């Protein structure tokens, strides 16, 4: 059983955090939350998504899981207005998700959870660098970097967080000293290189966050963590590095 109501914009932003990386996902539902874990087809990026029942106006559920075609789901959510109320109901007989919003009524066919790729385990990473900054700042850096290259370095050097991209002809570098960050902790200088294709997808959601925590090492995956739904949800992205040649 699953029946809930929530602000449409809040829910759309939450689901977008998953749909930026994968086209389908298995969502686990409990009496307290909705969660999902997914990895992209190339095994380069992973997302962990948790949305607490407190994010909803009403929330009634028993333990279960559903498979959702995120492309179709986001098409429906894209029809909602910012202040619309979104009502969700899992029809137990048809195994379809009934969606009502702004006078519109949709019925979304669900996927067999067993047909969806197995959920990944989120690795516990202890990395030497931890940077906290505004999501819009990181999004701006990614947008600048993609003008000159298809990959981007994230690093910390001498208490300064930097973003750097270098192409065949051009180079861009953004430096943010510790004083201009929300916080910075680093036991050593660190640097890793990442695909801008993935970063560009990730910042679509991450760029809206007031605070993003970046856990960073050298030639290690980067971990991005931020809150959604006014602190009633959390999204974690993990992105594998591109190893720089000497």
UniProtKB/Swiss-Prot annotation:
GO function terms (MF aspect): DNA binding; DNA polymerase processivity factor activity
UniProt superkingdom: Archaea
Keyword Amino-acid biosynthesis: no
InterPro entries hit by this protein: DNA_clamp_sf (IPR046938), Pr_cel_nuc_antig (IPR000730), Pr_cel_nuc_antig_C (IPR022649), Pr_cel_nuc_antig_CS (IPR022659), Pr_cel_nuc_antig_N (IPR022648)
CDD domains noted in UniProt: PCNA (cd00577)
UniProt KW DNA-binding keyword: yes
Sections of the chain in a coiled coil: none
Function: Sliding clamp subunit that acts as a moving platform for DNA processing. Responsible for tethering the catalytic subunit of DNA polymerase and other proteins to DNA during high-speed replication.
Family to which the UniProt record says this protein belongs: Belongs to the PCNA family.
Protein name: DNA polymerase sliding clamp
Organism: Methanocella arvoryzae (strain DSM 22066 / NBRC 105507 / MRE50)
